[in-house]
Swiss-Prot record:
Catalytic function, reaction form: RNA(n) + a ribonucleoside 5'-triphosphate = RNA(n+1) + diphosphate
Keyword Transferase included in the entry's annotation: yes
Primary gene name: rpoB
InterPro entries recorded: DNA-dir_RNA_pol_bsu_external_1, DNA-dir_RNA_pol_su2, DNA-dir_RNAP_su2_dom, DNA-dir_RNAP_su2_hyb_sf, RNA_pol_bsu_bac, RNA_pol_bsu_CS, RNA_pol_bsu_protrusion, RNA_pol_Rpb2_2
Upper taxonomic lineage: Bacteria, Bacillati, Bacillota, Clostridia, Eubacteriales
GO cellular component: DNA-directed RNA polymerase complex
Species annotation: Clostridium kluyveri (strain ATCC 8527 / DSM 555 / NBRC 12016 / NCIMB 10680 / K1)
Bias (Acidic residues) ranges: 1195-1212
Keyword vocabulary terms for this entry: DNA-directed RNA polymerase, Nucleotidyltransferase, Transcription, Transferase
Protein name (database record): DNA-directed RNA polymerase subunit beta
Record-linked PROSITE patterns: RNA_POL_BETA (PS01166)
């Protein structure tokens, strides 16, 4: 039944039927944990991999002994970094030891290796003043993968790929003639026996003795034209290095370096773990019949007798005592199964070795050698440490290769299984830490080359570590990663939810991942292993669908990078569901039957029903209660945070829920945030973890509160914690970040208590929109095609008003002709244009500005012109140089206006770091209040989006029997075909809740039912169907049937009409074609494309057409003359030759064709060579800005607004302005159900 739940400072009435068992993990721990791992272990691993660096004579030896991040010498705090456009980083100091073996001299030094970017508490990085997020990447895990294809005759052909983390690939394939081939590193294929011979089994008998008799092996041997180990080596060498003289030694060293050199071939821990899992013996011999006795080699005991079936325990026992091949009987033939000879070390050692940190299986021959030669605990421990790389090899070993071949042979008999590459057991996550580690490794290996060179060149006696090490390549590779990697993205900061989701995003794109074009349907599709790990709902529409995903709410990432999800264990003996929580990866989960979270259970934890619905891989089946192994932890564990915020998700169609999830991320923070009346109960957790709320660091008592500061007196030592609040800061997306205190003086706070509200939060809960009184009714056609009719009350009361802050900057540089100057003294500008400019030439704070107003007065020196004699005389008399400057002031761009809220000035003199050639930098921040207006895009949480079509006076809006007018009317036709019924349930429940004064929590898949809602409506005194008689505001007559009325949570999205509306008469033109530019950003025109020209041709509108193709576009002289004619009120002159025609002629001339243009009388028309020649004689400049091209090149580098990948992410056809689409417009683009 409905019960109160306390969330932060608010109590919600919850309809949840389930007790919360485990808590949701911290939502940004993916980022934080990964970065901490990198600082603690990741960096260390890279240094260990590269140690030691030796010169070519192996005399000098350079080692990295240790490192530390110097946290005390961080130059600027996070806030200062944002202000100064610098990077939030700490110096990395590395201790380096140089050993000269000849003289035995050791030199140790601490070397500075560049500033290393630090992660903020919110899981972001500040790079050049911009907040960025490193997105986790989903990649194929290193390992062995087997696949099957069917040939024309219906025969199964098996193939396999051995994928390392880095190094050469091995690919096996079988053809229709039963011959198995191998490709080494994508070269031409060889019979597989050549590889086996080269590995050491030289003759045919050795091969058959090792792998057992097998038809496919026989066929391959017949095909193979080499007969010995040496011949095979030479054959491989010829294939891999064609054109070089083959010798046995060079072939041997080639193979060594390809596969067995840890510097060239790296499996990584994950790869080794996947190899051992896939190639282990016990998984393939389980439930098979042995053809001979299996004997323990140590004790001589018979583990399995001839003809006995091997059960799971026996199979594990066989592998763990070091047996590596077993013959089994399949369909009257004997098949030899070979493993890769790895065992669990704890079965062989009777003392505790936890401190050695060995979690993987170890290579049995290496272990046996240690145990045979040493007996004391000390010496064994010592040897294990010394030989750790032999016990757990980083590279592939011969036994791995034999095991992969054996697996390939076994597949034909149904032993082993093929793999599904889209299964999350075979895809892993590379989070920040690992991506950084790989990048750091690239930098270090480049540095290693430099060090080796310097070792040989410099004098070995006086050399120091400092002189050897060049930190440039390391610093550059880190900088490159943060600045321009596809996975380092400009943070989406529209609201707290979009920040949180961005940090939890998983991308399959990026370096080493997929590309949009190659990704097929399978990769993008929802897979059964996504359950509880990746959200099946939240993914962008458009070209990236399914390639960019979101982490599910309860998911965690394990040490190998696989995503795990929690389950409750079922005690099968007592048939009780326990509260023990187990995290499982996707391939572990496949072995169990898992019940759903809302399966009815009595108070003792027993199942109520005897038959239970469970998941078994991709099937949902019904089984007896005693067969269930685990149970889901929570009904919302399969969806992401944004999706979990949609109430009644279970009643929405999936594609609409997808739009709902994505649009919540685009909601603009409003002036007065309001938490949803109908929520899901996750709003508090999401806001707290998003990092926009200041939380108490320690328990204590609030001693002081004002608008921008809160002080808390600590209980522990009586000291004071000070929390500064952010006031009206600009976010990455230009929305407003503002924090307001929600605690009072004297209030007792615990550690983690929310002290203040941030943007889009209300009492610590995420509040993206407003609860609006609305009805599903049409009104005079203003609801056509999802449009919304809103009441003027929403405008008057600032219900949907938001603040937007834009940043403009101007820099004074040194030019060839002298320095630019920021000044109030601007040529040809009247005094009234300077009324708000102070004496420095910079606008005053608080001034109201409109488009075209000067923000920063700046003049640039012009080239000195040749002086006339009179001027020289005047100059000689007055000594006054006529100032040759032109006005390059920063002005407010078209369509922008607002109030100056902040001005920041940085100068060289004050010691601010500015880019080279810049003397002074001025930044102005303009804030504007944007009220809701016609053309703004609004949406609910269920994918029900629309554009405002009309603002109606409140007296004309339909009103309720008690006289309250509706605030919004939505079209009822928007509901049935879209199948997002959740919005209707939300409206009904909101209607009842507002009357009862409740805030409600209805968690996804565990929320209010239809009966609950009817119950609430009755309690509130409304009709059971939630409908009401409405009256027409204009006439006072009732409408002819009752209408569904209630409260819906409505968001205002970041697609505001003010940012899209745009007009141009004249403006900038493209340099080559002389046609107007396109798009609002360039102050461009509307393209009149090919199809539009056809339309005019079809009408026969010849003059209009000629005008559009010439004077309105690229007839340089004609357009200026036309402009003058319009200004003077004369007739428009005849068009001339368009520039495109000249370009065409130039291209034909480039093909050596002599082209002449003739008039009616066969006289040649002379074309001017260049645009400049034509413009020389014209005295009017219609480009608006005389140096448009110059000013656009002033800024060599601008922080990209969004990064490229993001740009393509949000291709939402409904919101594209026409000029974004260029001319590949299709009519379907405008159809809502695209």
């Amino acid at each position: 039944m409905v019960h109160p739940v306390r969330v932060g400072k608010r109590t919600r009435m919850s309809f949840s039927r389930l007790k919360e068992i485990g808590h949701m993990p911290n939502l940004i721990e993916v980022q934080l944990d990964s970065y901490n791992w990198f600082l603690k272990e990741g960096l260390q691993e890279v240094f260990e991999d590269i140690n030691p660096i030796q010169d070519y004579t192996a005399n000098l030896n350079l080692e990295f002994v240790g490192y530390k991040l110097d946290m005390d010498n961080i130059k600027y705090s996070v806030e200062e970094c944002k202000e100064r456009d610098s990077t939030y980083a700490a110096p990395l100091k590395v201790k380096v030891r140089l050993l000269n073996k000849e003289t035995g001299e050791v030199k140790e030094q601490e070397v500075f290796m560049g500033d290393f970017p630090l992660m903020t508490e919110q899981g972001t990085f500040i790079i050049n003043g911009a907040e960025r997020v490193i997105v986790s990447q989903l990649v194929r895990s290193p390992g062995v993968y087997y696949d099957v294809s069917v040939d024309k005759t219906g025969k199964n052909l098996f193939s396999s790929t051995v994928i390392p983390n880095r190094g050469a690939w091995l690919e096996y394939e079988t053809d229709s003639n039963n011959i198995i081939y191998v490709r080494i590193d994508k070269t031409r294929k060889l019979p597989i026996t050549i590889l086996v011979r080269a590995m050491g089994h030289g003759t045919d008998t050795e091969i058959t003795n090792f792998f057992g008799e097998d038809e496919r092996l026989k066929a391959t041997i017949e095909k193979d034209n080499t007969k010995t180990h040496e011949e095979a080596l030479l054959e491989i060498y010829k294939r891999l290095r064609p054109g070089e003289p083959p010798t046995v030694d060079s072939a041997r060293s080639l193979i060594e370096s390809l596969f067995f050199d840890p510097k060239r071939y790296d499996l990584s821990r994950v790869g080794r773990y996947k190899f051992n899992k896939k190639l282990s013996l016990h998984l393939r011999i389980v439930n098979q019949i042995s053809t001979g006795d299996v004997v323990n080699p140590e004790t001589g005991e018979i583990l399995v007798q001839k003809g006995e079936k091997i059960d799971r325990e026996k199979a594990v026992q066989i592998q763990q005592c070091g047996i590596n091949s077993v013959d089994i009987e399949i369909e009257d033939t004997t098949l030899r199964v070979i493993g890769n000879n790895f065992v669990n070390i704890n079965n062989f050692i009777d003392f505790n070795i936890d401190d050695l940190n060995i979690k993987e299986s170890v290579y049995y021959p290496a272990l046996k050698q240690i145990l045979d030669n040493y007996s004391s605990e000390e010496s064994i421990r010592e040897q294990i440490k010394k030989n750790i790389h032999n016990l757990i090899p980083k590279h592939i070993i011969r036994d791995d290769i034999y095991a992969t071949v054996s697996y390939e042979l076994g597949l034909a008999y149904g032993v082993g299984h093929t793999d599904d590459i889209d299964h999350l057991g075979n895809r892993r996550l590379r989070s920040v830490g690992e991506l950084l580690q790989n990048q750091f490794r690239i930098g270090l290996s480049r540095m290693e080359r430099v060090v080796k060179e310097r070792m040989t060149i410099q004098d070995q006696e006086v050399i120091t570590p400092q002189a050897l090490i060049n930190i440039r390549p390391v610093a550059a590779s880190i900088k490159e990663f943060f600045g321009s990697s596809q996975l380092s993205q400009f943070m989406d900061q529209t609201n707290p939810l979009s920040e949180l989701t961005h940090k939890r995003r998983l991308s399959a794109l990026g370096p080493g991942g997929l590309s949009r074009e190659r990704a097929g349907f399978e990769v993008r599709d929802v897979h059964h292993s996504h359950y509880g790990r990746m959200c099946p709902i939240e993914t962008p529409e458009g070209p990236n669908i399914g390639l960019i995903n979101s982490l599910a709410t309860y998911a965690k990432v394990n040490e190998y990078g696989f995503i795990e999800t929690p389950y409750r264990k079922v005690n099968k003996k007592e048939k009780i569901v326990t509260n023990e929580i187990v995290y499982m990866t996707a391939d572990e989960e496949d072995e169990y039957l898992i019940g759903r979270a809302n399966e009815p259970i009595d108070e003792n934890g027993k199942f109520v029903d005897s038959k239970i619905t469970v998941r078994d891989k991709e099937d949902v089946i019904v089984v007896p209660a005693e067969d269930v192994d685990y149970m889901d932890l929570s009904p919302r564990q399969l969806v992401s945070v944004a999706t979990a915020m949609i109430p009644f998700l279970e009643n929405d169609d999936a594609s609409r829920a997808l739009m709902g999830s994505n649009m919540q991320r685009q909601a603009v923070p409003l002036l007065k945030p309001q938490a949803p009346v109908v929520g899901t109960g996750i709003e508090y957790k999401a806001a707290v973890d998003s990092g926009v709320l200041p939380k108490a660091r320690n328990a204590g008592v609030v001693s002081y509160v004002c608008a921008n500061e809160i002080r808390v007196r600590r209980d522990s030592d009586g000291g004071t914690d000070i929390y500064r609040l952010l006031k009206f800061q600009r976010s990455n997306q230009g929305t407003c970040i503002n924090q307001r205190p929600i605690v009072e003086k004297g209030e007792i706070v615990q550690q983690g208590t929310v002290l203040a509200d941030g943007p889009s939060t209300d009492l610590g809960e995420i509040a993206l929109g407003k609860n609006i009184r609305m009805g599903f009714t049409t009104w005079e056609g203003y609801n056509y095609e999802d449009a919304m009719l809103i009441s003027e009350e929403l405008v008057k009361k600032d219900v949907f008003t938001s603040i937007h802050i834009e940043e403009y900057e101007s820099e004074a540089r040194d030019t060839k002709l002298g320095p630019e100057e920021i000044t109030r003294d601007i040529p040809n500008v009247g005094e009234d244009a300077l009324k708000d400019i102070d004496d420095r030439g910079i606008i005053k704070i608080g001034a109201e500005v409109r488009a075209g107003d000067i923000l920063v007065g700046k003049v640039t020196p012009k080239g000195e012109t040749e002086l006339t004699a009179e001027e020289r005389l005047l100059r000689a008399i007055f000594g006054e140089k006529a100032r040759e400057v032109r006005d390059t002031s920063l002005r407010v761009p078209h369509g922008e206006a607002g109030i100056i809220v902040d001005v920041k000035v940085f100068t060289r003199k004050n010691g601010d770091e500015l880019s080279p050639g810049v003397n002074k930098l001025v930044r102005c921040y303009i804030a504007q209040k944007r009220k809701i207006s016609v053309g703004d895009k609004m949406a609910g949480r269920h994918g029900n989006k629309g554009v405002i079509s009309r603002v109606l006076p409140e007296e004309d809006m339909p009103f309720l029997p008690d006289g309250r007018p509706l605030e919004i009317c939505l079209n009822p036709l928007g509901v049935p075909s879209r199948m997002n019924i959740g919005q209707v349930l939300e409206v009904h429940l909101g209607w009842a809740a507002s009357e009862l004064g409740w805030h409600i929590a209805t968690p996804v898949f565990d929320g209010a039912t239809e009966e609950d809602i009817i119950e609430c409506l009755k309690k509130a005194g409304y009709r059971e169907d939630g409908k009401t008689i409405l009256y027409d505001g204009r006439t006072g007559e009732p409408f002819n049937r009752p209408v569904t009325v209630g409260y819906m949570y409505i968001l205002k999205l970041a697609h505001l009409v003010d940012d899209k509306i745009h007009a141009r008469s004249t403006g900038p033109y493209s340099l080559v074609t002389q046609q107007p530019l396109g798009g609002k950003a360039q102050f461009g025109g509307q393209r009149f494309g090919e199809m539009e020209v056809w339309a005019l041709e079809a009408y026969g509108a010849a003059h209009t057409l000629q005008e559009i193709l010439t004077v309105k576009s690229d007839d340089v002289v004609g357009r200026v003359k036309t402009y003058e004619a319009i200004v003077k009120g004369e007739n428009i002159p005849e068009p001339g030759v368009p520039e495109s025609f000249k370009v065409l002629i130039k291209e034909l001339q480039a093909l050596c064709l002599d082209v002449k243009v003739l008039n009616d009388d066969n006289q040649e028309i002379k074309l001017k060579e260049s645009v400049d020649e034509e413009i020389e004689n014209l005295d009017v400049n219609i480009e608006g800005n005389e140096d448009f091209v110059l000013s656009s090149q002033d800024n060599d580098y601008e922080e990209p607004e969004e990064n490229d990948e993001e740009d393509e992410l949000n291709l939402d056809y409904d919101d594209l302005t026409l000029d974004d689409l260029k001319d590949d417009l299709k009519i379907e683009d405008f159809n809502d159900e695209h």
